[in-house]
């Protein structure tokens, strides 16, 4: 496939939008002289740029675009906007609010609540730092109102960004049709494009009533953001990062919180050091971690929910217990892909047993011209991953960068636990499995951050560096402690670039910080 010519903008810079227009036969405007350009700018400033208008399609007509994106979440929006920048006529189909899980019921409102919880923790330390009368009364409704206002503002920003990029927003639910060429139908109207991206994300899983009687009395992480008051008594079910984060937030803000897990540790897919330390920190912070436990039944009573559970510690007889007066039972047991309502079978688009759309390394499905990115694919369920994959795809499709694809190796991730976790690369066990135990060297440390030098409340900071072969290439970094969420990004760049232990040793550390402990590890 031939690359588009590097057409120049009026300022002499390469413009892929101009190149794309030229390749489609659109005339390119000639560069204006500087004086004329300034005059035009002044004139344009006095009026709003008109939006492109066209005759409305008839009811039976099929509307065509260069790029159709199903899903207005982070990945879909990023891909659509990048495609538009490259000259494509794009449209986004969204049945709910723009921004997807991340903006509406995920990363963004979660981080606001985590920040709130951190304030609560620091309040307890103010006396140790010499401040008196530091006991503050928390009002859940105040932060909920401010949080929701912030989210609404982001929804508007996304809407404005699409409008400025001349990307059409199609409101409604998309389903594929049986037409000869890939086509979707939204609210009775059909749309088609040579390139269609599925970026519909995922949704929280919850058990069926047939599995756990009364399960529907609980909520999911989506429902967490609808709570009007801080629950007095909370039970969180799950051992993944969502369960850990919500349990930590509720506990820090004053809710009596139990975290029910099937095994003896949380975050079992993380490095063993992180899994062990995070479990301990939860317990130290006052979260009741119910290990080897599962919910058996949920009942509604006059004083709240009654949660019956069974605890089956290996080597012991199972024990049945009940937690009464529960205000909030929250299921955080995983996420399912939003793929069932798309009629994928009409085109024969393949999915796995859970409904995740199967794609190759270039985000292609098994059907030509149909692609998928983000949580609906079930791989690395992180907002920045969906954004990066969506943009890479746009460059491949509309800039003819045939090798443009996301490298899924060494993706950094953070858990907003208390204290936060940062991790990138292979765990110790993964490295041993990949390189052999004799070829793996581990460096680790554990210490109390300087912040806690004068506080009664203590949290640890633990760090681990995983290195491979004689050159000791750093293939993994894992840490939990104050500030680890912010310090990870720089270390992730080093890991991505292939840094060695010697590179870290040769770097002068910043003192006094927690991050300096990772540089000269022994």
From Swiss-Prot:
Residue numbers of N6-acetyllysine PTMs: 97
PROSITE patterns, alphabetized: PYRIDINE_REDOX_1
Disulfide bonding pattern of the chain: 102-107
GO molecular function: flavin adenine dinucleotide binding; glutathione-disulfide reductase (NADPH) activity; NADP binding
Catalysed reactions, semicolon-separated: 2 glutathione + NADP(+) = glutathione disulfide + NADPH + H(+)
Name of the top EC class for this enzyme: oxidoreductase
Transmembrane regions listed in the UniProt entry: none
Enzyme active site: 511
Co-factor binding comment: Binds 1 FAD per subunit.
Gene Ontology CC annotations of this record: cytosol; mitochondrion
Range annotated as the organelle transit peptide: 1-43
Keywords (A to Z) from UniProt: Acetylation, Cytoplasm, Disulfide bond, FAD, Flavoprotein, Mitochondrion, NADP, Oxidoreductase, Redox-active center, Transit peptide
Cofactor(s) named in the record: FAD
Signal sequence region: none
Residues given in the record as FAD binding sites: 74-75, 94, 101-102, 110, 174, 375, 383, 511
Family per record: Belongs to the class-I pyridine nucleotide-disulfide oxidoreductase family.
Oligomeric form and interacting partners: Homodimer; disulfide-linked.
Free-text function comment from the UniProt entry: Catalyzes the reduction of glutathione disulfide (GSSG) to reduced glutathione (GSH). Constitutes the major mechanism to maintain a high GSH:GSSG ratio in the cytosol.
Protein name: Glutathione reductase, mitochondrial
Species in which this protein is naturally found: Callithrix jacchus (White-tufted-ear marmoset)
Gene: GSR
């Amino acid at each position: 496939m031939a690359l588009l010519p590097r057409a120049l903008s009026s300022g002499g810079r390469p413009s892929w939008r101009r190149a794309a227009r030229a390749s489609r036969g659109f005339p390119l405007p000639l560069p204006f002289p500087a004086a004329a350009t300034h005059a035009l700018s002044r004139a344009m400033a006095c009026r709003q740029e008109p939006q492109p208008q066209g005759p409305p399609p008839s009811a039976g007509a099929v509307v065509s675009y260069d790029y159709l994106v199903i899903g207005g979440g982070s990945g879909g929006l990023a891909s659509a906007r990048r495609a538009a920048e490259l000259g494509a006529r794009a449209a986004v189909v969204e049945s709910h609010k723009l921004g997807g899980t991340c903006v509406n019921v995920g990363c963004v409102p979660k981080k606001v609540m985590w920040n709130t919880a951190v304030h609560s923790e620091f309040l307890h330390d103010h006396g140790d730092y010499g401040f008196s009368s530091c006991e503050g009364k928390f009002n859940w409704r105040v932060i909920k109102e401010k949080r929701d206002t912030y989210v609404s503002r982001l929804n508007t920003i996304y809407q404005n960004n699409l409008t400025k990029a001349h990307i059409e927003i199609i409101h409604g639910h998309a389903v594929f049709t049986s037409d000869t060429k890939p086509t979707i139908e939204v609210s009775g109207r059909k749309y088609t494009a040579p390139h269609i991206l599925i970026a519909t994300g995922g949704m929280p899983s919850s058990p069926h009533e047939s599995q756990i009687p009364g399960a529907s009395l609980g909520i999911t992480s989506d429902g967490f953001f609808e709570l009007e008051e801080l629950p007095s008594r909370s039970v969180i079910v799950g051992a993944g990062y969502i369960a850990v984060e919500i349990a930590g937030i509720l506990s820090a803000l004053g809710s009596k919180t139990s975290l029910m897990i099937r095994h003896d540790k949380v975050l079992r897919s993380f490095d063993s050091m992180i899994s062990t330390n995070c479990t301990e920190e939860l317990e130290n912070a006052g979260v009741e971690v119910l290990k080897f436990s599962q919910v058996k039944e949920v009942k509604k009573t006059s004083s709240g929910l009654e949660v019956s559970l069974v605890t089956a510690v290996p080597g012991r007889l199972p024990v049945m217990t009940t937690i009464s007066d529960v205000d909030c039972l929250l299921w955080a047991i995983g996420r399912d892909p939003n793929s069932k309502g798309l009629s994928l079978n009409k085109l024969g688009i393949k999915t796995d047993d859970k409904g995740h759309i199967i794609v190759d390394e270039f985000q292609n499905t098994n059907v030509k011209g149909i692609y998928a990115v983000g949580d609906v694919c079930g791989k690395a369920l992180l907002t920045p991953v969906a954004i990066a994959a969506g943009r890479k795809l746009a460059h491949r499709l509309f800039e003819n960068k045939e090798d443009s694809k996301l490298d899924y190796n060494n993706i950094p991730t953070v858990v907003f636990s208390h204290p936060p976790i940062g991790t990138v690369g292979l765990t110790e066990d993964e490295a041993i499995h990949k390189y052999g135990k004799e070829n793996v060297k581990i460096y680790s440390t554990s210490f109390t951050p300087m912040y806690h030098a004068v506080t009664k409340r203590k949290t640890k900071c633990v760090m681990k560096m995983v290195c491979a072969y004689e050159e000791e290439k750093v293939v993994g970094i894992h840490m939990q402690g104050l500030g680890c969420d912010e310090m990870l990004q720089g270390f992730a760049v080093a890991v991505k670039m292939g840094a060695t232990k010697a590179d870290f040793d040769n770097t002068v550390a910043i003192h006094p910080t927690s991050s300096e402990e990772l540089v000269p590890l022994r």
